[in-house]
């Protein structure tokens, strides 16, 4: 395969030994202006992006398991709007920016790509293991975890042909939004 790091033009067959460079560069955190939400306790909204090194790279999934856990933590609680959801594309897009739900745009959620409503929704595998009730701004604990214990495998995936898997103009793919005070 000519795109492999160890490509050998003289190779006569594919022996499965090709290695490929990772398109992943880093994680990037950005603060979102949430002043229209009229929060009273100094809440701040953050967006977490994966930065990639090429516009044709894509992220189709992220997962956690027994040896590779995920943890997103705060010293307070995560904000969860009453019309919100734990995965961005499960939020009703028509409510975002509506006077009926002025803080919905600042809900805490995970995603792959930036779309409230997509043709192909993200698939959550083993949803019970995500511990989504932890995204609860009124009574919830201060962290969100996945993986790290026996039989805690969990994944969020999109089909590889889903446009949400591709990076934006800054070569970033949105992974989540988290509002906390």
Task: Show which residues each predicted segment covers.
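Primarily marks secretory-pathway-exposed extracellular/lumenal segments that are disulfide-
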Residues: 1-181
């Amino acid at each position: 395969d000519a795109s492999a790091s160890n490509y050998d033009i003289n190779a006569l067959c594919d022996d499965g030994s090709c290695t490929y460079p990772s398109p992943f560069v880093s994680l990037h955190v950005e603060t979102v202006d949430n002043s229209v939400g009229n929060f009273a306790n100094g809440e701040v909204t953050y967006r977490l992006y994966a930065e990639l090194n090429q516009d044709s790279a894509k992220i189709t999934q992220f997962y956690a398991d027994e040896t590779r856990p995920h943890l997103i933590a705060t010293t307070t609680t995560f904000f969860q709007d009453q019309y919100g959801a734990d995965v961005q594309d499960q939020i009703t897009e028509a409510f975002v920016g509506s006077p009926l739900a002025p803080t919905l745009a600042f809900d805490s959620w995970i995603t792959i790509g930036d779309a409230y409503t997509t043709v192909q929704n993200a698939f959550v595998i083993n949803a019970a293991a995500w511990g989504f009730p932890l995204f609860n701004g009124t009574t919830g604990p201060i962290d969100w975890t996945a993986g790290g214990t026996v039989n805690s495998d969990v994944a969020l995936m999109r089909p590889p042909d889903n446009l949400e898997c591709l990076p934006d103009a800054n070569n970033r793919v949105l992974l989540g939004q988290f509002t906390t005070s």
